[in-house]
A protein has these predicted regions:
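Generic alpha-helical secondary structure signal
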Residues: 67-74, 82, 173-177, 242, ...
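Conserved NTP-binding/hydrolysis core of motor NTPases
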Residues: 85, 94-271
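Glycine- and acidic
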Residues: 54-58, 66-82, 103-113, 163-165, ...
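Short glycine/serine- and small hydrophobic-enriched flexible loop segments
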Residues: 93-98, 307-311
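Extended alpha-helical interface modules used as scaffolds for assembling large macromolecular complexes
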Residues: 1-9, 13-20, 28-36, 153, ...
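N-terminal pre-P-loop "Q-motif" helix
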Residues: 81-91
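Extended, charged/polar low-complexity intrinsically disordered regions
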Residues: 1-77
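Conserved active-site and cofactor/substrate-binding residues in soluble primary-metabolism enzymes
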Residues: 67, 86-87, 300
Length: 329
């Protein structure tokens, strides 16, 4: 009698260390960027696993040849300037979080701050859709328990979790000093184990986090060094013009299948992106120090998201310097 195959159940989206693949419900990508489809029952027989997730995923793709990545980047820059380039770069770098933590024992947070009407949410929704996810992230609210919020963070590995509307202060279930440990790949939340000894259990924080808010909530200098901040402008501040409105309508008109196709092409490029990102980081940190960035941690955090900007039409040496000195144009 033939034995039934042993299938492992994975309850997280994103990177799966055991298989080395990225899982998005009923699709997966291997290290070479090859797309793998589950069978009609959701099993990846070649990988010996099943990805169990209640999250909504965009599975349909347009013709990949119909997507010109550079044109998409130009559209984003027309709306947001270099902010869009840095934001997309952070989402790409987060796919490699496990590599950053292994090599450097640290991975930064992203902050997207600016007044209502500056387009932050539109950009975040677009980037979530690029990586196949039909969600907007987690809302900052005190009503959620620590355990519930911790579990929501746990269910994504090497994907960005938008943390929305922490305007001026973080909720009680996400204390600011918890970010210090999470920066180094630790847990955001710990609890006592149900045992007689001193054992503590903590859900690992393997995702990236983008804080999306009107006012930044950070007060601790040590936390601020671990956050890359992008400042967005609304119409009153000159950030929204007739030209950007036209481009925004074009962006909003892109179907989720089109956005997912952009992600598909990026996943196909991931091995090359990985090689270039890590090859360029050291030189970028040297450039930042030469331009007055004295903190090694600040130089590192900014080099993470600036390691693959050339193909996005962003001068690779100028952009991180502009960002780290506070000019987000």
């Amino acid at each position: 009698k033939q034995k039934a195959p042993v299938v492992r159940l994975v309850d997280r989206l994103g990177y799966d260390p055991q298989s080395g693949c990225y899982l998005f419900g009923k699709i997966a990508y291997d290290q070479k960027g090859q797309r793998i489809a589950a069978n009609d029952k959701g099993f990846f027989l070649g990988l010996g696993l099943r990805c169990s997730s209640s999250e909504l995923i965009e599975y349909n793709l347009d013709n990949p040849d119909s997507i010109d990545l550079k044109s998409i980047i130009q559209l984003l820059r027309k709306i947001y300037g270099n902010r869009a380039v840095f934001a997309m770069s952070y989402f790409i770098a987060t796919l490699l979080k496990q590599e950053f933590v292994k090599k450097h024992s640290a991975f930064p947070f992203l902050s997207m701050a600016g007044p209502k009407g500056s387009g932050k949410t539109t950009l975040v929704d677009f980037l979530n859709n690029v990586f196949f996810q039909l969600w907007q992230g987690i809302a900052a609210k005190d009503a959620s328990t620590d355990k519930a919020v911790g579990r929501r963070f746990y269910h994504r590995h090497s994907l960005v979790i938008p943390f929305n509307e922490a305007n001026g202060s973080l909720p009680k279930n996400l204390p600011e000093n918890a970010l210090l440990d999470a920066f180094h790949g630790g847990s955001l939340y710990d609890r006592a184990a149900k045992s007689q000894d001193a054992e503590v259990i903590g859900l690992p924080f393997d995702a990236g986090m983008a804080f999306v808010q009107n006012l930044e909530p950070f007060t601790m200098p040590a936390v601020k060094e671990r956050v890359v901040t992008l400042r967005f402008l609304n119409a009153e501040e000159g950030g929204v013009t007739d030209e950007t409105r036209t481009a925004m309508r074009e962006l909003e008109g892109l179907a989720t299948s089109t956005r997912a196709t952009i992600g598909h092409k990026l996943m196909e490029m991931l091995s090359a992106l990985k090689r270039d990102i890590f090859a360029e980081m050291s030189g970028l940190q040297d450039d930042l120090r030469e331009h007055g960035v004295l903190s090694p941690r600040v130089a590192y955090t900014h080099s993470v998201i600036a390691g693959k900007l050339g193909w996005m039409g962003c001068p690779i040496r100028r952009c991180p310097i502009t960002l780290a000195t506070g000019l987000n144009g």
